UniProtKB/Swiss-Prot annotation:
The keyword Nucleotide-binding applies. Keywords: Antiviral defense, GTP-binding, Nucleotide-binding, Nucleotidyltransferase, Transferase. Its EC number is 2.7.7.65. It holds the Pfam family NTP_transf_2. This is c-di-GMP synthase. It comes from Capnocytophaga granulosa (strain ATCC 51502 / DSM 11449 / JCM 8566 / LMG 16022 / NCTC 12948 / B0611).
């Protein structure tokens, strides 16, 4: 039976999640989990599922807030939001960067086609109030300065942040990347606008229903829509319903990927979907060690069942994770399955 070098893995995990070697974090880990102190596989699983300490996470948020304060000096008619794994507490690095969205409030993209389709397909199920809301949106005036507004927000942000931060990389098409050296944190600043479809309009533009579109500096275009706030809301809600178990599984797979000798080409977006897709009743009453065979079963089913893998959707439900032609990503899934399989085999005598 293949066995992992758990001493090395545990050291990797500690360096990643507690890079400053804060003793109180290590002490708390062993006091909270006395059963794992002398057992390598249990110790690794426990730490791999644990969240990053708030001491680190709070610094990432604070670095984002400092950037926001600088931008508020020069930008008008924008709204600031955060996206990414820090917002769901599924990040695995103590020194995690954070994504600050700078969203224009001057305009929004209206998905007219989606609204027209909803009016036609759901005309007998929608209330009169909702029908009127959708119809009213279609009467709105078009806005013709969208790209220029976003370009201007990007240029002003570059100028301001370059004057404030010694490390400020403005070469990336979709983000400005700064490093706050005193805090040891990176922040990605992303220029965007709101995107509204029928669901957003019907739900009074509550943030979880609104999409965003990111500005691409290189092509001077607006990218396709994303729904980061719906994903954040769904992961947080499902994990709350399962007393943190969903987030434990997400962190576990992300740590396995990070510790693997193989190059596993699966993003956090992909791993979120893999875990979110598991029926919550399967793990609602499982302890942390019992989550490992549940993950093994999920990955094994995806690898062996073409219908299941081809139908797996993102957490927000708007896109498929594994396209039929993406062989590399499916191979990466097999690699991740193998990593889980080894841990599972080492764990079985303790279940």
């Amino acid at each position: 039976m293949e066995k992992k070098n758990y001493s090395a893995l545990f050291e990797n995990l500690q360096n990643r999640s507690n890079p400053e070697k804060l003793q109180e974090i290590t002490t708390k880990f062993f006091s909270d989990n006395p059963d794992v102190k002398y057992n390598d596989v249990l110790k690794y699983i426990t730490l791999a599922m644990n969240g990053v300490s708030p001491e680190y996470t709070n610094k990432s948020r604070e670095a984002g807030e400092k950037v926001k304060l600088h931008l508020q000096d020069i930008l008008l008619d924008v709204e600031y939001q955060y996206q990414g794994s820090v917002m769901t507490n599924t990040h695995i690095k103590g020194y995690s960067d954070i994504d600050l969205l700078v969203i224009s409030d001057k305009f929004y993209t209206l998905d007219e086609r989606n609204i027209i389709e909803n009016l036609e397909v759901n005309k007998f199920s929608l209330s009169q109030e909702k029908i009127q809301k959708l119809q009213q949106e279609l009467l709105g005036k078009k806005y013709h300065s969208a790209t220029n507004d976003l370009k201007n927000n990007r240029l002003l942000s570059e100028q301001k942040l370059s004057s404030v931060y010694e490390i400020c990389d403005i070469t990336h098409p979709k983000a400005i990347k700064i490093t706050n050296k005193s805090m040891g944190r990176d922040v990605d600043i992303v220029i965007a606008n709101w995107y509204d479809d029928a669901q957003s309009v019907i739900n009074n533009r509550q943030i979880e229903y609104r999409g965003i579109q990111i500005y691409n500096k290189r092509s001077n275009t607006i990218e396709n829509r994303d729904f980061p706030f719906l994903s954040i809301q769904r992961i947080n809600k499902r994990s709350s319903e399962t007393k943190g178990r969903l987030k434990k599984m997400i962190r576990f797979l992300k740590n396995l990927k990070a510790d693997s000798d193989e190059k596993i080409e699966l993003s956090s977006f992909d791993i979120n979907a893999i875990c979110y897709n598991i029926e919550k009743n399967k793990y609602l009453h499982s302890n942390k060690y019992q989550l490992v065979p549940i993950l093994y079963e999920q990955l094994n089913e995806l690898v062996s069942n073409s219908n299941k893998i081809n139908s797996l959707k993102s957490v927000d439900g708007h896109e498929y994770i594994f396209s039929r032609n993406n062989i590399d990503k499916k191979e990466s899934l097999k690699m991740l399955l193998q990593e889980v399989k080894i841990i599972y085999s080492n764990l079985q005598s303790y279940l």
